[in-house]
Design a protein with these regions (language model features):
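Short hydrophobic alpha-helices and adjacent helix-cap/hinge residues
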Residues: 1-318
Length: 318
């Protein structure tokens, strides 16, 4: 433990020292939520603090919620790039793509991007190129396991609707992966791309009784209540991509917690502020993948949760 603390202190010291005597570094934060403080923001703060970097002394966070509005995300990204920020932190693929279209020079670190190569954000994982790096949430790689967990929790499911945003290229790739593994799991996959909340609600209302639902990444940015309320009403067998949804009432999720990803990405942020180039920093994969279940929802829906799933679960919400 002492060695870890010493290593973090040595890592952060040059940046803190450089910040003395001049204005703190400015980090623009663009995220999908409705309020400034969301899990990715809190995760970023925690990660920077663990590195010994203090808000106010070493850096400031200029936070821009986009309320699920892609056009607003583009506007905020363009304004931040022109304002002289030292780095932009982007949550979600579509926000990261908006930032990339706004600037080719301001460094960007992303989180909650399922497949950054498929999304066109980086040239490759080991050699990102350009002004971009970040933490991949592995949407494509985790899709087979998500379907396996869906089948384990809801064994009667035979048909699964994969609903994703039409502009989210990572989710499109995950939908193709779902098709590839469907035969092995004896499932029929129906992939549907949507663009608006109305599209999403309309699509979900066409689910047949007993149909399963898979959301490989965020479908509609910042509106979890819509999909969760509909799930509870229709008693869908559904699996989500992060524990955030389970905490809000979903039955089960498998994937990386966004606050953990943001804390992990803080190391990349610090390295860039120290002078390293994003193109030289390989894209990292989420280092925390967890299975989470919500027992209250399980009880409300009358689901018999397999003992193996309860034992395997990393997080259980009572």
């Amino acid at each position: 433990m002492c060695l870890v603390v010493l290593a973090l202190a040595l890592f952060a010291a040059p940046l803190a020292a450089d910040a003395q005597g001049k204005p703190p570094y400015r980090i623009g934060v663009v995220h999908t939520g409705f309020v400034p403080n969301t899990p990715p923001v809190e995760g970023l703060r925690a990660g920077l603090k663990a590195l010994g970097l203090q808000e106010g002394r070493d850096l400031t966070l200029d936070i821009h919620p986009t309320k699920g509005d892609l056009q607003l995300a583009q506007t905020e990204a363009t304004a931040l790039a022109a304002s002289g920020v030292d780095l932009i932190f982007a949550e979600s693929e579509r926000i990261a793509r908006a930032v990339k279209s706004a600037t080719q020079t301001v460094p960007m670190v992303f989180v909650q991007v399922g497949d950054p190569v498929a999304a066109g954000l980086v040239t490759s994982v080991p050699h990102p190129g350009g002004n971009v790096t970040g933490v991949s949430s592995l949407a494509t790689e985790l899709t087979p396991k998500r379907l396996e967990f869906l089948k384990a929790v809801f064994p009667s499911v035979r048909r699964v609707r994969v609903v994703y945003h039409a502009d989210d290229l990572s989710s499109g790739a995950a939908a193709h992966t779902a098709q590839d593994v469907a035969g092995r799991l004896k499932l029929k996959i129906v992939a549907r791309a949507v663009r608006t909340e109305a599209d999403l609600v309309s699509e979900l209302k066409t689910l047949r009784p007993g149909d399963g639902l898979l959301s490989p990444t965020t479908v509609m940015m910042g509106i979890p209540g819509t999909i969760l309320d509909l799930q509870l009403m229709a008693r869908w067998p559904a699996i989500f991509y992060t524990s955030f949804w389970v905490q809000g009432g979903a039955v089960v999720a498998y994937g990386s917690p966004v606050d953990h990803d943001a804390a992990q990405a803080a190391r990349l942020v610090a390295r860039i502020l120290r002078g390293e180039r994003p193109q030289d920093l390989p894209v990292e994969s989420s280092n925390t993948i967890e299975l989470s279940i919500n027992l209250k929802t399980v009880t409300a829906l009358g689901i018999t949760m397999p003992a193996a799933i309860r034992t395997r679960a990393d997080r259980i919400f009572p």
